[in-house]
Amino acid sequence: MDSTRLDAAVAARGLARSRTHAARLIANGYVRVDGTPVVKASFPVGDEQSVTVDGVDRYVSRGAHKLIAALDAFPVTVEGRLALDAGASTGGFTQVLLERGATRVIAADVGHGQLDPIIGKDPRVVEVEGFNLRFATPETLAGASGVDQLVDLVVADLSFISLGLVLEPLISVATPEADFVLLIKPQFEVGRTGVREGIVRDKDLRADAVANVLWAAYDLGLPTAGLIPSPIAGGAGNLEYLVWFNRDAGSNPTEWLDRVTEMTGA
C-alpha cells in the first residue's frame, strides 16, 4: 500500500495552506486519521484513509488568542499605530495587530524562516529576521527594518530569555506614550532551579516571576496599567500572564500585588 506523510497529505487534500501549516495543525492535535488524533507529521497515510481537521483555527498560531485576550481586557488602541511584535515567530501576534488596524507592524525575531507566508506577504508587515532584541536600539532597529521612527505599540511573546533583559531595549525603540502588552512566562523568569519537567509548579515562584517583571518595568519608568492570566497555557502547560505597561495609565506595582497573588494562586 502506498503511503504519504501526514503533513503532506493534509496539505495535498486542501486541509491546510501549506505543509508547514499542516505540521502545526498536526502538532496542536487538530488532525485525525480514520477518526484517531495523530500528532506526528511523519505518520504514514494511505490514499484510502480518512484525514480530517477538527476546529481549524484561522490564526497562524494559538498564541494569537493570548494577545486577543489582552486587547479585549485592556483599553489599548491598535488602529493607526506603528507596532513592534517582539519575538514574532510565526506571526500570531502580528496577525491580531493587522486585524485590529495597525498601520504597520515590525515583526522581529532572532530566528529565521518562521513567519507564516500568509502574514509576511501583507504589505503592512516588515519582517526582521535574525534580530536579537536584547541589543535593540533605535538605530539598529531602523537599520534592520528600514522604518526610521519610534514605535508607539510594543507586543511581545519571547522565549528563553527573561523580560528583565529586554525591557530597556524595547523602551528605547518606543515613543514615551507607547503601550506595552507583554506576555510574562514564569518558566523563563525563575531560573532552572524553579522549573521541574519544564513547568513552574511552585505558585510562590510564579508570583515572584510576575512581580519581578512589574518592578523591573517600573524601575525603567513603566508603571503597570493592567494584568490578566493568559487564557491559554504555554509550553508544557505553564501558566502565563499578560501585562500592560503605560507611563500615563499605570501605577506602582505595590497596587498590583494582590492581583498577582490572586492570579498565581500564591
Question: For each predicted feature, which ranges?
Answer:
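Flexible, glycine-/basic-rich loop-and-beta segments that form/coincide
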Residues: 239, 245-266
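Short, glycine-/aromatic-enriched active-site segment of Class I SAM-dependent methyltransferases
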Residues: 186-202
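Conserved S-adenosyl-L-methionine
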Residues: 96-104
